[in-house]
Swiss-Prot record:
Belongs to the frataxin family. This is Iron-sulfur cluster assembly protein CyaY. NCBIfam families: FeS_CyaY. It comes from Pseudomonas putida (strain ATCC 47054 / DSM 6125 / CFBP 8728 / NCIMB 11950 / KT2440). Involved in iron-sulfur (Fe-S) cluster assembly. May act as a regulator of Fe-S biogenesis. SMART domains: Frataxin_Cyay. The gene is cyaY. The keyword rRNA processing does not apply.
C-alpha cells in the first residue's frame, strides 16, 4: 500500500530533522539550510548533499556530486531504501560523508 500524502510528509520531515540534528552534533565544518522542504548540507570543501521530497512519487531524493538517488520508504524496516541499488539511506550517507569529509558518522537511525 502506498504512503498517504500526510504520512509521507511526516516521514520526510522527521528524516530531515534527524539529519539536521545528526550533522549539528557531528562537529563537522558544514553549513545547512532547510527551505521549502529542501535540506542542503554544504561541506567545507564545497561538496553538497541536497535532500528533497518528490510528493507525486512519495520518494525522498538525494543529490550528490556522484549522482541522484531516489529512496522509497519501507514500512516493514522503517528505512528509506534506494530504488535502484536497494542500499539504505543511512548506509549511503555513511559512505558519502566519509568520502566528502573524512569522518565516520552513524546514520543507523536514519
Amino acid at each position: 500500500m502506498s504512503l498517504s500524502e500526510a504520512r509521507f510528509h511526516d516521514l520526510v520531515d522527521a528524516t530531515q530533522q534527524a539529519l539536521e540534528d545528526l550533522f549539528d552534533e557531528s562537529g563537522l565544518d558544514l553549513d545547512m539550510e532547510n527551505s521549502a522542504g529542501v535540506l542542503t548540507v554544504k561541506f567545507e570543501g564545497g561538496a553538497q548533499l541536497i535532500f528533497s521530497r518528490q510528493e507525486p512519487l512519495r520518494q525522498l531524493w538525494l543529490a550528490d556530486r556522484s549522482g541522484g538517488f531516489h529512496f522509497d520508504y519501507d514500512e516493514d524496516s522503517g528505512k528509506w531504501v534506494c530504488e535502484k541499488s536497494e542500499e539504505l539511506l543511512g548506509e549511503m550517507l555513511e559512505r558519502i560523508v566519509w568520502e566528502r569529509a573524512g569522518e565516520k558518522l552513524d546514520f543507523d537511525e536514519i
